[in-house]
From Swiss-Prot:
This is Glycerol-3-phosphate acyltransferase. The gene is plsY. Probably interacts with PlsX. One of its GO terms (biological process) is phospholipid biosynthetic process. Pathway: Lipid metabolism; phospholipid metabolism. It is an enzyme of class 2 (transferase). Belongs to the PlsY family. It comes from Anaplasma phagocytophilum (strain HZ).
Length: 192
């Protein structure tokens, strides 16, 4: 049963809302505009109003799944729920529907922590807003927030949960490697 849940988590995470919604509503292929990333920040560059919906749906695809599994006691341990979350994030980053070329996993990663650790969620948003307000770089804000939540996770969770969240965070940070290079070279574009 757990294997089926993991497969479902991956497939749900693989739904490329940024691609689908920009194709349907903006008549554009998100993979061919802006940063070419299949995520909410790039959608913002194409259609500001649509970006909020993409963000919510990318968060929801992991948050609703984990919340439901937890609430209905289908998956009982936090460790197993973290594995489900990790598969959702993997699906978002490497979606089967787009030849394994997806987004960076930040929003889907937020969806993982919403039902599991409210403190991590608060730290994520505070650090993201603080960094963004001072720099206007969405990528740097995400990187700082992921690192901050990793620290909080190690301080508040069991070793296995912290390890699983670290794996998830490393995947997300790895997807930001080009942003990191551009930030170092001072070539990264600000959002606003």
């Amino acid at each position: 049963m757990f294997i089926a849940i993991l497969m479902g988590a991956y497939l749900l995470g693989s739904i490329p809302f940024a691609y689908i919604l920009t194709k349907l509503m903006a008549k554009r292929d998100i993979r061919e505009v802006g940063s070419k990333n299949v995520g909410a920040t790039n959608v913002f560059r194409v259609n500001k109003g649509l970006a909020g919906l993409v963000l919510l749906l990318d968060i929801a695809k992991s948050a609703v799944l984990i919340y439901s599994l937890k609430e209905y006691d289908i998956v009982s341990t936090k460790e197993e729920l973290c594995i489900v979350g990790l598969l959702s994030v993997l699906g978002h980053i490497y979606p089967i529907w787009l030849k394994f070329k997806g987004g960076k996993g930040v929003a889907t990663g937020i969806g993982v922590i919403i039902p599991l650790n409210p403190l991590m969620l608060c730290v994520f948003f505070i650090s993201w807003l603080f960094t963004f307000n001072n720099t206007r770089y969405a990528s740097l804000s995400s990187i700082v927030s992921i690192i901050a939540t990793m620290i909080v996770c190690y301080l508040t969770e069991s070793g296995v949960v912290a390890l699983l969240y670290t794996v998830q965070s490393i995947l997300i940070l790895f997807k930001h490697r080009e942003n990191i290079v551009r930030l170092i070279k001072r070539e990264e574009k600000k959002v606003i």
